[in-house]
């Protein structure tokens, strides 16, 4: 019994000694040992986790043009590629796209002249290698026939403008407005407008508009065919138009066939005559020689 008590005492002493050593660990001899306090009051050693490995900066991917580039595609195309990936059992969508490109090789060569191999890759002894400098075409960038290699494709015209040199887009080759029977403004005289060339209306304050300031701009139309003259005014010197207001009005009334009011509206000479009379005061005191015949 005594031996058992002695053995238990020695064991307790050893445990106390061990806890004493663990309570004050030497960081130089045991850098990985730490103390953690538990609810029962005992201190237990805990090992620290190893530091995570740093990721290598070495790029293991093949350097080609367009690597890591996002490609936008319509929703229908993306859904179809995803469906083919599941149906063909491929691991990724990129493998499915590669499968599609391999099947479409003849059409690609026919359209572009090159295959699915990257443009910068060069086959050396059966292996593809990336050159450090861009390839230079022989004969100054020309092929065997001497013509420049055309790599651009014809695209549909998405512009809102039309090329004026393209004859298929213009129906009028002269550059003028087409002659059509259009009714611009108000037809005062009820004249058939078939075959007339429309003119833009002129605003107020121009020399071509007759009438008072309260009237709107008028529209003139010139017939394109040889018909009866619309304004039958004989060829006379300019000075004779401003000789007498009554004579000019009478001549315009007789030449118009009874339609006095419309002819007065189109009379430019009478309007200029009256302006000169207002500026000169009276016909006798006017310094100008507008009354001379």
From Swiss-Prot:
Region of interest (Disordered), residue spans: 45-67
One MF term in the entry's GO annotations: DNA-binding transcription factor activity
The keyword Signal belongs to this UniProt entry's keyword annotation: no
Biased composition (Basic and acidic residues): 56-67
Disulfide bonds: none
One Gene Ontology term from the biological process aspect of the record: regulation of defense response
Main location: nucleus
InterPro entries to which the protein is assigned, alphabetical: TF_TCP_subgr, Transcription_factor_TCP
One cellular-component annotation, GO: nucleus
Keywords: DNA-binding, Nucleus, Transcription, Transcription regulation
Domain TCP: 57-111
Subcellular localization(s) per the UniProt record: Nucleus
Pfam families (UniProt xref): TCP
Record-given protein name: Transcription factor TCP19
Organism: Arabidopsis thaliana (Mouse-ear cress)
